Amino acid sequence: MGSKSTRKLWAVHLAKGSKVTGKKEPTTMTLGKAFRGRVLGIDPSLRGSGFAVLDYAADGTARILEAATLKLHPKLSMPECLGAIGNQVDDFLNQHSVDHVAVEQTIYVQNFQTAQILGAARGAAIGSAAMRGLPVFEYAPLRVKQAVVGMGRASKEQVARTVQNITGTNFELRFDESDAAAVALCHAFTWRDTSV
């Protein structure tokens, strides 16, 4: 079967009585309903995970309800650390009526063992949320920084300052906490409910 050129296809189309008008049919694009509610942001790490519960109101204001850094002793075994991460997520979910969970994706690492450890820490956090049937969303660090600060290569200090300015937080956040809050803000700013 030979292929027809665009010119021949148009000739056949016009020969059948179709008209070409300069007007295009208007198209509508639906972005979906913006996120409103509470999101638990997680910056996972085996020894120092950050957590932040963010309330994103209908008027677009965001405030941090609670933030914490889970620092674990180097002598704890990996399974003990993973259990502690899962328990911390459970504690946040028990204390706050969370609608969504947002987790920072693992950045590219060259060391295979480091990648495995980070993946396990993420799995412990995601597993706790998934066991409750909560929707879990993952965001790359560059996307988080772009959505919150406006620059994909922003420093931790810039992220922390921007998070404090956006949320009106009057207490100092550790970097792990501000990173977790930034993941939650990224989700609140960018997620759309396309089911409506």
Range-by-range predicted roles:
Residues 1-196:
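Phosphate- and other anionic-substrate recognition elements at nucleic-acid/protein interfaces
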